[in-house]
């Protein structure tokens, strides 16, 4: 087993998430199991910062990270492929290109001016769509026009395009 890259200590959030602790090592897949209503989704959302946590500590590569919202989690390399892709994972009225580029603007438009490097964006989108074999006529089609499986591929590809350290999949 590799080094510990992700750790949650004593996470509490609402009535469903009580004293959750676990570690994930490099290359390891960790599952959170439980019956429907056991708090799996609530746990993932609290870790990602989509819902507030009352207490607990989150560590990435051995360093405590402060996650007050999804932007903090993304910056720390922790991302979420949510249970409801249409509601929480995609902007269905936007193109596949935009869905991949939007969460990666910090990588595509570095610097004070915030100008998107279109060549870098095109390369990122091309690699992401080819790696995941997203079936579509082109990257300009609305995400809503894709099949459910291809929509899910867009959700995952946008996060892997930024080389995230930890990807949380909620069902």
Regions found by a protein language model. Give the residues of each.
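Glycine-rich phosphate-binding loops of nucleotide-dependent enzymes
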Residues: 1-171
């Amino acid at each position: 087993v590799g080094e510990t890259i992700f750790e949650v200590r004593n996470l509490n959030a609402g009535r469903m998430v009580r004293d959750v602790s676990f570690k994930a090592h490099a290359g390891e897949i960790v599952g959170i199991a439980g019956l429907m209503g056991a708090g799996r989704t609530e746990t993932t959302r609290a870790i990602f910062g989509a819902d507030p946590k009352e207490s607990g500590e989150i560590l990435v590569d051995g360093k405590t990270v402060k996650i007050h919202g999804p932007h903090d989690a993304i910056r720390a390399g922790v991302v979420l492929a949510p249970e409801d892709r249409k509601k929480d994972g995609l902007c269905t009225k936007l193109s596949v290109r935009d869905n991949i580029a939007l969460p990666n603007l910090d990588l595509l438009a570095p610097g004070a001016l915030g100008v998107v490097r279109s060549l870098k964006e095109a390369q990122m989108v091309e690699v992401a769509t080819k790696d995941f074999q997203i079936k579509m006529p082109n990257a300009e089609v609305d995400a809503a026009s894709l099949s459910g499986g291809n929509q899910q591929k867009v959700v995952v590809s946008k996060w892997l395009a930024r080389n995230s350290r930890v990807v949380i999949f909620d069902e």
